[in-house]
């Protein structure tokens, strides 16, 4: 009898349904090229388990109540729900092309970007019912929200643009050209910051109308950006150049660049102050000490992309990469 990948996946996930909590905390590393999720012990920095998925996972998001970690499998067209403390599978839900996903600050909405299908879906976060689908010209990629959850800002890589969706009206507020192949998005101090891969800059955008007001050079292939837990530093991964740049959050002035070979992509922050950085082209994760510039290396699966850290004792304190 021929055993399909779907059957093997179901059996593997069944075995994961009753895992004990990880004593030292667990890191979820999403291997987009390996159709898997690596579970890494945060103390030993060793992979302790690998969870298969159907096709091609990329990003994850922690549910507002902190009880579920959602992982999107784009080609598999489903979202998997895991216990963030034990990695036990909770459920699976059909979702079209869930490349990037994120909950609004008020916990009311879940927005899912379908990069391949050129669509942005807005769900009711409580019921998981689709509220509206927005057809997009080309490649909706990353996102972030206004703090009051009134708008979500989505980078459109295929048209060098960004769009703002009014979540109260479920309507497009504006679409504007902002650079060349924009990717990561971050709300900061009343403005929207966008990592613009094609120009090697971080672009500052007015959230009211999409006007570009400033550009900050960070490095070749500026891909994604993340706010530090203390809100003092913005970290920018320059994927093509193999560097990670720190910006002063108050002035947006570059402070320092760190060499991290292998395509630094997403970042999560550990309680000990170190940064976990996925290295997209290297099958590895760098655990960077920002004080020394040195990093430890964690071997994971092929093309690691999104990640989530669940330290010992509190999943709610973890930071998931967008």
Residue ranges: model-predicted function:
Residues 11-322:
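Predominantly soluble domains enriched in secretory-pathway, periplasmic, or organellar proteins
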């Amino acid at each position: 009898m021929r055993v399909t990948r779907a059957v093997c996946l179901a059996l593997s996930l069944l075995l994961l349904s009753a895992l004990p909590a990880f004593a030292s905390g667990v890191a979820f590393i999403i291997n987009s090229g390996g159709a898997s999720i690596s579970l890494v012990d945060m103390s030993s920095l060793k992979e302790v388990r690998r969870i298969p998925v159907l096709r091609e996972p990329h990003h994850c998001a922690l549910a507002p109540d902190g009880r579920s970690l959602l992982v999107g499998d784009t080609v598999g067209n489903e979202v998997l729900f895991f216990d963030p403390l034990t990695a036990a599978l909770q459920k699976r839900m059909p979702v079209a092309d869930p490349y990037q996903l994120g909950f609004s600050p008020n916990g009311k909405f879940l927005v899912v970007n379908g990069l391949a299908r050129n669509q942005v879906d807005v769900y009711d976060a409580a019921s998981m019912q689709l509220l509206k689908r927005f057809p997009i010209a080309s490649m909706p990629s990353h996102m972030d929200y206004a703090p009051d959850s009134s708008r979500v800002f989505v980078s459109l890589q295929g048209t060098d643009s960004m769009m703002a969706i009014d979540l109260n009206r479920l309507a497009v507020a504006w679409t504007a050209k902002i650079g060349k192949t924009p990717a990561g998005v971050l709300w900061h101090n009343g403005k929207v910051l966008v990592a613009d891969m094609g120009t090697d800059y971080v672009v500052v955008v007015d959230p009211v109308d999409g006007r570009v007001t400033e550009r900050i050079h960070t490095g070749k292939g500026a891909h994604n950006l993340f706010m530090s837990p203390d809100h003092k530093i913005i970290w920018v991964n320059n994927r093509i150049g193999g560097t990670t740049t720190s910006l002063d959050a108050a002035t947006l002035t570059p402070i320092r660049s760190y060499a991290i070979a292998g395509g630094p992509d997403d970042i999560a922050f550990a309680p000990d102050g170190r940064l976990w950085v996925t290295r997209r082209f290297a099958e590895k994760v760098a655990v960077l000490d920002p004080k020394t510039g040195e990093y430890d290396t964690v071997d994971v699966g092929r093309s690691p992309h999104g990640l989530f850290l669940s330290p010992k004792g509190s999943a709610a304190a973890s930071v998931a990469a967008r």
